[in-house]
């Protein structure tokens, strides 16, 4: 049986964590990015399908390729973030299922239903993006996830000729708390949940 994590860990992962828009000039090492993936890959996905593919943009050249896809409200915070992760999904993720889910012919579930394949890839890569955010927080990093961008431009600029399609962007770094907005409310249990 698992033990509950400490109240301090819960604060770090959830209640005190914030979405950041400003960043300190502290780099994020390649080793840290590898450590992030080493954590987030263990989050569950349907049939262990693991459809997310991540491009970590760290260079000025990479940010310039990304710039035309960004909405005006997301431009500055993305260009100044130490890292911007493009979380994409592989439309042919099922080709890896003989390795990832060897218990049966799971590949055929998706090759026979393109709609199921797309829904599964998008939904599960979104879950994996959430695992990446939690992994960042666990390692002392801050994040700024965004869906306000031109996905077609990102796909053309970074994934042309491949089976990858962009899902969302996540800025990663060490946040500047002086640039945080006042915390916004969340729905109560009664507003968001039901008991049957």
Curated annotation (Swiss-Prot):
Instruction: State the top-level EC class.
Output: oxidoreductase
Q: Which InterPro entries match?
A: Nitroreductase, Nitroreductase-like, Nitroreductase_HadB/RutE, RutE-like
Q: What does this protein do?
A: May reduce toxic product malonic semialdehyde to 3-hydroxypropionic acid, which is excreted.
Q: What UniProt keywords apply to this chain's record, in alphabetical order?
A: Flavoprotein, FMN, NAD, NADP, Oxidoreductase
Per the UniProt record, which EC number(s) apply here? 1.1.1.298
- Name of the protein in question: Probable malonic semialdehyde reductase RutE
Q: Which Gene3D superfamilies match?
A: NADH Oxidase
Origin species: Shigella flexneri
Q: Family assignment?
A: Belongs to the nitroreductase family. HadB/RutE subfamily.
